[in-house]
Amino acid sequence: MKNLIFLFLLFSNATFAQSGRIQIAFLGVFHMGESPDYKQGSITDLLSAERQKQIQEVVDDLVKFKPDKIFVENTPDTQPYWNGVYRNYLNGIKPNEKSSEYNEIFQIGIKLAKKLNHPIGVTCVNFVQPDLVVGTRIARNKVDTLMTFYSHELELKRPSYDDYFLRNPSVKKAFDDYITNYESWKNLTIKEHLLNLNSEKSISTLHYFNITGWMDTNTNSFGAEFTAKEYYRNAKILQNILSSVSPFDRKLLVIIGGGHVQVLKDMLKTHPYFEVVDANKILNDL
């Protein structure tokens, strides 16, 4: 009922329609802390004085965009934790856990929220399909139960990444070329690194070897299913974003792993009430 009321207010409000679309920017990032990615994108000296100065430069650029909400790649069940991190940071207390401090949610999202005097900090919108035991326990309906069983059975067919690359030479080449470039970016400033990562070529390559590449050789005869599962995950992420938007929001920032950016942009670019803004234009001072 709450979402229905919101949609009515947002998409039927004549004042909103006259005032223009909501701007939304997707900032693709390397996962600074722990992540399940095949290759970690960490920068080992992130907490050094020089790197922290570079982080502040990025935050200062994002401040100029003035997002009303900041969305981050963690699941909604972790929202209370990050609310606590934000409250502590407002009082000058950094996270005790290294994995939390060494994380783009804190380093960019929380720091940006503080600069903007946001009341709630960041909003968690990630979606991860739960495993069989958890998924069947928390299922709200038959569809949830069926999706849990479907995901479980599909994952049993998923090859290792090494096997995936062995069977898909074009994906392997795209991945190797990307990693070669990526390693060279580690010598750049954080801003330069993000500008490279969010370039059109980088985002499209990430989309290819993370999502659509599964279909090239119909991996294990389930190529389309692996690709569809990635689209489903991103659709759930977008649903979480849309469900968190209020009629008063004018600008939104999504800080998320680079592999998600292309599909999320594609899903929103035809939406009549949203305007996708290039994150690199923001980093380049609009």
Listing of model-derived features with the role each one plays in the protein:
Residues 1-22:
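Bacterial Sec-dependent N-terminal signal peptides
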Residues 221-286:
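A cross-kingdom marker for long, charged
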Residues 66-72:
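Proline-aspartate-enriched helix->loop->beta-strand connector
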Residues 33-36, 78-83, 130-135, 261-264:
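Short catalytic/ligand-binding loop motif for oxyanion handling, primarily in non-cytosolic enzymes
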Residues 31-51:
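Acidic/histidine-rich helix-loop elements
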Residues 72-77, 125-128, 182, 256-258:
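Short, well-ordered beta-to-alpha junction loops that form the rim of enzyme active sites
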Residues 49-59:
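N-terminal post-signal-peptidase region of extra-cytosolic proteins
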Residues 82-85, 92-243:
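Hydrophobic, often amphipathic alpha-helical segments used for membrane interaction and targeting
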